[in-house]
UniProtKB/Swiss-Prot annotation:
One of its GO terms (cellular component) is cytosol. Pathway: Isoprenoid biosynthesis; isopentenyl diphosphate biosynthesis via DXP pathway; isopentenyl diphosphate from 1-deoxy-D-xylulose 5-phosphate: step 2/6. Keywords: Isoprene biosynthesis, Nucleotidyltransferase, Transferase. The keyword Nucleotidyltransferase applies. The keyword Transferase applies. GO terms for molecular function: 2-C-methyl-D-erythritol 4-phosphate cytidylyltransferase activity; cytidylyltransferase activity. This is 2-C-methyl-D-erythritol 4-phosphate cytidylyltransferase. Its EC number is 2.7.7.60. It comes from Synechocystis sp. (strain ATCC 27184 / PCC 6803 / Kazusa). It is an enzyme of class 2 (transferase). Belongs to the IspD/TarI cytidylyltransferase family. IspD subfamily. The record marks 13, 20 as: Transition state stabilizer. InterPro entries: IspD, IspD/TarI, ISPD_synthase_CS, Nucleotide-diphossugar_trans.
Length: 230
């Protein structure tokens, strides 16, 4: 399985002023934890990391001590996640049939989640890891008034990895560029193209590290895991 990791974010909501994936988490850059989980996966054979060239020296520095037995390629990302993934697709090795896409900021994903998504992708053309929402969701208008309360039973919170047939994903990205679609994940492109996307149960701990509170939670969970494996 081939894996693409968008890692070109600026970390504005983290208040760091630079790429949040380079923030220190228990002595290692956040991105390092994400890559280590992918390397520990039995199914991942190749990894592409999309980022900005000025971050490449830092990426190379965090990759060196990992001594990856699998190829890891740095790919120039775009101004948006959608553009970065498009660039990553173009850089896939010839013959790549399927691809997983995983947010660099989801450093708590386990190797098992990558492997379960890989297995599920053998039986569909598109999937996402997701979890049923636990909170009641309110739809609110621009003035702050609740307009609806959707049935929670049918609501799932999207995570990554998301997995796709490469040829289909390329076609949907091309269609998106032609139509000017702007989406926040690749599953939405398939949806707009009328293609079905399957849900694979994600993980409660698979948080996207976006705020300082998220970072503190990640440090706690990774610390607990490290203690158990010691």
């Amino acid at each position: 399985m081939h894996l693409l990791i968008p890692a070109a974010g600026s970390g504005k909501r983290m208040g760091s002023g630079h790429n949040k994936l380079l923030l220190n988490v228990l002595g290692q850059p956040l991105l390092s934890w994400t890559v280590q989980a992918a390397l520990a996966s039995q199914s991942i054979e190749w990894i592409g990391i999309m980022g900005q060239p000025y971050d490449f020296p830092a990426f190379e520095a965090l990759l060196t001590p990992l001594h990856s037995p699998k190829p890891v390629q740095l790919i120039v990302g775009g101004d948006t996640r959608q553009q970065s993934v498009f660039n990553g697709i173009q850089a896939l090795p010839p013959g790549a049939k399927f691809v997983l896409i995983h947010d660099g900021a989801r450093c708590l994903a386990t190797p098992d989640l990558f492997d379960r998504c890989t297995e599920a992708l053998q039986h569909c053309q598109g999937l996402i890891a997701a979890m049923p929402v636990k909170d009641t969701i309110k739809i609110v208008n621009a003035d702050g008034w609740i307009t609806d309360t959707p049935d929670r039973q049918g609501l799932w919170g999207a995570q990554t990895p998301q997995g796709f047939d490469v040829a289909l994903l390329k076609a949907c990205h091309d269609k998106g560029k032609q139509e000017g679609w702007e989406v926040t994940d690749d599953a939405a492109l398939l949806e707009k193209c009328g293609q079905p996307v399957k849900i694979v149960p994600g993980e409660d701990t698979n948080l996207k590290i976006t705020t300082p509170v998220d970072l503190a939670i990640a440090e706690f969970i990774l610390g607990q895991r490290s203690a158990k494996s010691a």
